[in-house]
Amino acid sequence: MDRAKSRSSITMVLLMVLSTFVGLGTPAATASEIVMTDAIEITPGGTFNDRMVAVDADSLGNTHFVWSRNTQHLYYKMLDARGEVLIDDTQISDPGAHRAWHPDIRVDHADMVHITWTDKAGQWAIMYTLLDPSLDDQSGDQTTDAAISIVGDYEVSLHQQNRDWPAIDVDSENDAHIVWQDSYEPLDMFYQQPQIYYKMLEI
């Protein structure tokens, strides 16, 4: 009996001592070792003023980009995990006068693309659109807004005063949650100082 207790005590001590050496053989990762790709040019731009880009990735490792071109229209592009173009630069804001600023993007669990931005044409508005890239053949050429849009340009918020800097995320039900900075205050209690507003969109 005493011999069995002694063996189990020795075994426990050995396990505790050996467990301290488990992590010693793991090599430390540095930033230069975890870079997956070299920097690549997403859009050549040329005479265009492409700015304010946002990016997210889907379940297959494809990357989805949205940006403002000439601070007028919103553009979208999709690359595969190797950086090859699946959908080329495509205007996704509706035709007409726009002033697209500060877009944000989130890909949901069904690989649908949720986008929000500020339209500064006239009274500033927070906008939203929903894209389904799988509706395109993803052959590397442009598509059209009508071909991949599930929800067209939807007005999330438009009041007196101005609003800007929207951000978006999605939940486990793929519903969109949008926050933004807004100077609208119906009771005029804060002298039009920016407030934070939030809205959930059930898709």
Describe these PLM feature segments.
Residues 1-32, 178:
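Secretory targeting signatures
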Residues 31-203:
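Extracellular, repeat-based ectodomains that mediate carbohydrate processing or recognition
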